[in-house]
Amino acid sequence: CALPIFSASSSILTKKGIFSIETIVEKMCHAPAQIYGICNRGYIREGYQADLVLVSHGERWEVNTENIPSKCGWSPLEGNSFRWKVEKTFANGHLIYSDGQVDDTYRGEELRFDY
């Protein structure tokens, strides 16, 4: 993603009623892994890398510079509010984001492609 909006993109799509959660998972997880031939990614399956994002639906929250979990520290979505929120993120099974805190000590693994 070229802009720092990935964490809010699913919120936007569900808020506007554009896609169901199942369709968002298909478009943001399954399809990229299939299209680009990324090995062992994009699905929750035995033997696959555990790249997961846990989201919750609840209280409204507003995007601002204090709660943007991005090194760039800005977002074109500042000032917008959402009910969906990323609570935890796992990369290769390692917890790298939890309740607003980023673990920047973990380095992911190189992607492998099946061409």
Give the residues covered by each predicted segment.
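Active-site microenvironment of metallo-dependent hydrolases
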Residues: 2-115
